[in-house]
């Protein structure tokens, strides 16, 4: 067993060896290294063929047309292209956008930028289980609403939004619907023939592919138009200029192919590990699971350990690679904005840890993690005067603290 144990799959996944093996064939003189846009010789044709194959593999996971897949540098760029691209293109029809407070920063900060440009953005509060209420969403819709952006699976708490119902609602009001599916692709079935979703952001490194490559699904029927954010040689049908990185694209395609093949197996594996971890800690006192337990992917468990400071718990769990919040915000000392939006107080939000597992996690590693968690939490609580007061039955909300 290799220490520290990697339990941060929601931040990034290791590249599947099958993917790495495939990528190596597209870099050197021995392989297919050409520029896919070089139309005058075989090196270019072979690279273009490899890109086309990958585009088909990605489209297959979504049941989409390969022509609806636009390559980007990752889900962050896809979010930017989808939100800014649609908002700007359709700004004559209205300047109102709806999203939720628990979205990824790539969506929230893009919406903030639109606000600086004169758009109006409504940020929906989720329910305490992390789900978005359809009636609240409908109530927020206006005649000048042009775009709704709601993520499929949350990166911190793993809850699955009902994008089918949200899509129906948006389509009935002729509003463009964007979904960030970085955390759901390969974990939950996505069928764009059934779902009324217009734009979908995808990432390779959350699905055992390489970092630095992603895609944006752009619906053709009804056709969605976007204003390009990256200008140049007009690659990707003008949506996104820049030489295509064949090796990364091939890696993403292979990762999506394997994900489609192994989706059920990966799901059951993650579910068994999730239940094992949950069973190992649920009898501990003052432990809460954040986010709905049924409407969520099994790859994620976000747990608050009351009366334990999250940072000290992370330090105590030095043999576990876990995070408090998402990788994009884990460097800040602010409590998770996602957990605050669910209504958790600062103390509970600060005492939460995200465990996320995947294809290469073993039962042995989970058992070791359970043992480490139980020891660390008990030790830290022993040092906490608040824990003593709680054990004595004192309601800490009624305590008057002295202000110096």
UniProtKB/Swiss-Prot annotation:
The keyword Iron-sulfur applies. It is an enzyme of class 2 (transferase). The active site is at residue 328. GO terms for molecular function: 2 iron, 2 sulfur cluster binding; cysteine desulfurase activity; metal ion binding; pyridoxal phosphate binding. It comes from Vibrio vulnificus (strain YJ016). Keywords: 2Fe-2S, Cytoplasm, Iron, Iron-sulfur, Metal-binding, Pyridoxal phosphate, Transferase. It is found in: Cytoplasm. Master enzyme that delivers sulfur to a number of partners involved in Fe-S cluster assembly, tRNA modification or cofactor biosynthesis. Catalyzes the removal of elemental sulfur atoms from cysteine to produce alanine. Functions as a sulfur delivery protein for Fe-S cluster synthesis onto IscU, an Fe-S scaffold assembly protein, as well as other S acceptor proteins. This is Cysteine desulfurase IscS. Its EC number is 2.8.1.7. One of its GO terms (cellular component) is L-cysteine desulfurase complex. InterPro entries: Aminotrans_V_dom (IPR000192), Aminotrans_V_PyrdxlP_BS (IPR020578), Cys_deSase_IscS (IPR010240), Cysteine_dSase (IPR016454), PyrdxlP-dep_Trfase (IPR015424), PyrdxlP-dep_Trfase_major (IPR015421), PyrdxlP-dep_Trfase_small (IPR015422). Belongs to the class-V pyridoxal-phosphate-dependent aminotransferase family. NifS/IscS subfamily. Its cofactor is pyridoxal 5'-phosphate. SUPFAM superfamilies: PLP-dependent transferases. The modification N6-(pyridoxal phosphate)lysine is found at residue 206. Pyridoxal 5'-phosphate binds at residues 75-76, 155, 183, 203-205, 243.
């Amino acid at each position: 067993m290799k220490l520290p144990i990697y339990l941060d799959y929601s931040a990034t996944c290791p590249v599947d060896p099958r993917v790495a093996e495939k990528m190596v064939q597209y870099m050197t003189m021995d392989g297919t290294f050409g520029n896919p846009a070089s139309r005058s010789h075989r090196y270019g044709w072979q690279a273009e063929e490899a890109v086309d194959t990958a585009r088909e593999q990605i489209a297959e996971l979504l049941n989409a047309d390969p022509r609806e897949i636009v390559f980007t540098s990752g889900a962050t760029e896809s979010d930017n292209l989808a939100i800014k691209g649609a908002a700007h293109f359709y700004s004559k029809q209205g300047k109102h956008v709806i999203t939720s407070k628990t979205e990824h920063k790539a969506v929230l900060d893009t919406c903030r930028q639109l606000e600086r440009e004169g758009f109006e953005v409504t940020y929906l509060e989720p329910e305490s289980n992390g789900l978005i209420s359809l009636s609240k969403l409908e109530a927020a819709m206006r005649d000048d609403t042009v775009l709704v952006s709601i993520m499929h699976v949350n990166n911190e708490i793993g809850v699955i939004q009902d994008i089918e119902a949200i899509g129906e609602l948006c389509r009935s009001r002729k509003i463009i619907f964007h979904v960030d599916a970085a955390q759901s692709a390969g974990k939950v079935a996505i069928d764009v023939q059934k779902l009324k979703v217009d734009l979908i952001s995808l990432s390779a490194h959350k699905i055992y592919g390489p970092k630095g490559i992603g895609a944006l699904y752009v619906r053709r029927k009804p056709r969605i138009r976007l204003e390009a954010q990256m200008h140049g040689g007009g690659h990707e049908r003008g949506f996104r200029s820049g030489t295509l990185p064949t090796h990364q694209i091939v890696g993403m395609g292979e990762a999506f192919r394997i994900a489609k093949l192994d989706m059920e197996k990966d799901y059951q594996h993650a579910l068994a590990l999730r239940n094992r971890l949950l069973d190992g800690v649920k009898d501990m006192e003052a432990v809460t699971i954040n986010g709905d337990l049924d409407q969520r992917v099994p790859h994620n468990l976000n747990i608050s350990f009351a009366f334990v400071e999250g940072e000290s718990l992370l330090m105590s769990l030095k043999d576990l690679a876990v995070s408090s919040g998402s990788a994009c915000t884990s460097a800040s000392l602010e409590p998770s904005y996602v957990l605050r939006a669910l209504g958790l107080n600062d103390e509970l939000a600060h005492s939460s840890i995200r465990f996320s597992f995947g294809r290469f996690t073993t039962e042995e590693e989970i058992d070791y993690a359970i043992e480490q968690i139980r020891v660390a939490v008990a030790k830290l609580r022993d040092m906490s005067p608040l824990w003593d007061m709680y054990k004595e039955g004192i309601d800490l909300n009624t305590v008057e603290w002295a202000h110096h």
